[in-house]
Amino acid sequence: MFGGPLVINKELKIANNLLESLVRSYKSKSIYIEFRNLFEISFLKEVFLRHKFSYKRHLNLIVNLDDDTLLKKRMSESRLRQVKAGLKSGAVIKQAETIEELKEFYQILKEKYSQKIKKPLVDFKMFENFYRLPDAGKIFLIKYVGKVIGGIVCPVFGNKVIYEWYIGGMDDKLKKQYPSVLATYAPIEYGLKNKLVNFDFMGAGSPDRDYGVREFKSKFGGKQVEYGRYIRINYPLLFSAGEIWLKFLGMIKSL
């Protein structure tokens, strides 16, 4: 689950009742339950531990969209140059307008998940459903000479936050167009123009591991935070087997 228990005035009793009900309903139906926190809920740590959740350190980066000039001062000079160079090369940022465009982007994501992330990608139907719900968020595409070369799927919460969800670009093939850089910049630009509060990267990896993606994201002027994650493993053997299976799939795909 993305987010965390929503409780008014830090009411621990309400949070306890929510988690108690959740665990009772799903502990026998799920291998694990995980909260990927999108805001500060450290005051609930003892409540989570009481229900056999464990805390995992996990970073995030949040870009404040208060002012265009201030934001560009916070961004790295190299990243700003890449944005300008990509646009100057003829690449354009646009919102998805057709299912055909969305399918082109999905193929880019499939290749990324198969070759780099080495994990299954959700079915195209999910992206199509998101596209057909305009109030849910935005899908930005990067196009070059009429072809989709990258994009990003961004849920939007009210008039406050725009999130990075799925992102991919043909960076290896079109280096001068910087498709992933432009895809990341697209929701930032949209948020500035529409007076949103933050752009949320929705994760920057564990602080205990080197993570190249975190280095990439950090150059967009965001603030690093650690809201962490809480996980409850209901069936340890099945959970371990699933981890082994995913690693095995990754090895197979890399051959």
Q: Where are these predicted regions, by residue range?
A:
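Conserved short loop/helix modules at catalytic or binding sites
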Residues: 1
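Hydrophobic, Leu/Ile/Phe/Ala-enriched alpha-helical segments that form helix-helix packing faces
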Residues: 22-27, 109
